[in-house]
């Protein structure tokens, strides 16, 4: 409540360890991408080996099903080891919902895939 969303155009990996930390919206206009992160989710960059980065975030599998210019959280599927992470994403805490991009109605980890994308999580 009264918190402001941080915004950056710099493409870089980041981690949020504290589930009470302010959610962060990352905008990458050169790729047409927008990322929203909170509650222990780690987004990977070229400097992060995928295995170690995803392990530290508690993510056991990630499937990116989008073409360039269309990627946002709606096109990503996460499998998470710890249900605490899911509870934080699905919470009714106003500070999480107030920082969502306008096209999101509420945070969710049960996400859709873009047309023509195969389910890589099998």
Swiss-Prot record:
Region Disordered, residue ranges: 1-30, 96-122
Record protein name field: Putative uncharacterized protein SLIRP-OT1
Organism from which the protein derives: Homo sapiens
